[in-house]
């Protein structure tokens, strides 16, 4: 256990000789991290790190592997900030990354900041395995915090894989915001919660080049909307120097599995495609709850409804009053 109750823990690969290994494989198992002066650096955390703020930096060619606990939570104030940076980041099964605060959730930035903004080093590979908990919730008062799992969307090799549990909840404030973004995204089995018990729901943002809503994605999105978490899928269009291959980086959103929503809480579903939105299966909103659902479909190209791709609303509609 490494603790610094009132200060900050900063781990850099150059200074953490006991935490440095010689090689690390990329998620594709086809490439390895680029060497830095002949050495591929790996920062590994298997224990507990506890401080007000924690930074783990493996450098632009290094990697971070964490299977332990990283904690900047506070029992009496707003939680702190966690930054984990490197070329490749792997948060392994059983890990706990916590920024829970009595007066507001903190920030957990893995592989980059929100939408890649700021000066934080951007990862090429960011992985959060199943049975991992990342939590930036508010535990008493205040808003939920911010969680970002990011890999550089401008890099054609960029992959973000998130299969664990992400929370940025609130009790009486607003829910927090959660982003899972990269050129290619895998969110199979992910669990997300940015809801609020008494306040406004938060946001889950998904930002790849292309995105397909299949069985797993539909279940996850449906659960978040029904719990009061807003979901926004924003695709970008690749340049000629970006993604290549048969799938392309066109900026399309495809709905292959239907979404059946009950409206238990107010929420908004936004599909914002740089190119086309294709509905091969529908979106149905049933009148079984007291909440309100807002739908926003925005496309730079076409919105196509194929057979079975209807939008059905079985809900009371009230006209505005003068």
Summary of predicted features, one role per range:
Residues 1-322:
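Extracellular and secretory-pathway beta-repeat/beta-biased strand scaffolds
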């Amino acid at each position: 256990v490494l603790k610094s109750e009132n200060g900050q823990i900063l781990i850099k690969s150059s200074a953490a000789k006991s935490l440095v290994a010689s090689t690390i494989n990329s998620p594709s198992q086809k490439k390895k991290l680029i060497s830095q002066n002949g050495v591929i650096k790996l920062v590994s955390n298997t224990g507990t790190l506890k401080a007000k703020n924690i930074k783990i930096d493996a450098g632009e060619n290094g990697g971070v592997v964490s299977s332990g606990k990283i904690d900047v939570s506070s029992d009496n104030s707003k939680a702190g900030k966690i930054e984990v940076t490197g070329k490749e980041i792997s948060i392994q099964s059983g890990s706990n990354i916590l920024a829970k605060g009595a007066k507001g959730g903190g920030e957990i930035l893995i592989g980059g900041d929100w939408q890649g903004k700021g000066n934080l080093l951007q990862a090429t590979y960011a992985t959060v395995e199943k049975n991992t908990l990342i939590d930036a919730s508010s535990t008493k008062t205040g808003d939920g915090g911010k969680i970002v799992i990011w890999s550089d969307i401008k890099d054609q090799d960029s992959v973000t894989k998130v299969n664990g549990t992400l929370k940025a909840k609130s009790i009486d404030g607003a829910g927090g915001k959660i982003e899972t973004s990269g050129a290619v995204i895998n969110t199979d089995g992910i669990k997300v919660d940015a809801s609020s018990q008494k306040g406004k729901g938060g946001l889950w943002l998904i930002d790849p080049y292309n995105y397909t809503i299949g069985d797993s994605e539909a279940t996850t999105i449906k659960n978040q909307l029904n719990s009061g978490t807003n979901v926004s899928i924003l695709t970008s269009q690749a340049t000629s120097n970006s993604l290549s291959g048969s799938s392309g980086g066109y900026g399309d959103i495809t709905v292959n599995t239907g979404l059946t929503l009950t409206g238990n809480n107010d929420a908004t579903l936004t599909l914002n495609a740089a190119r086309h939105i294709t509905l091969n299966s529908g979106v149905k909103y049933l009148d079984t709850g007291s909440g309100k659902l807002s739908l926003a479909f925005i496309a730079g190209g076409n919105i196509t409804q194929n057979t079975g791709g209807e939008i059905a609303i079985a809900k009371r509609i009230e006209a505005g009053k003068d």
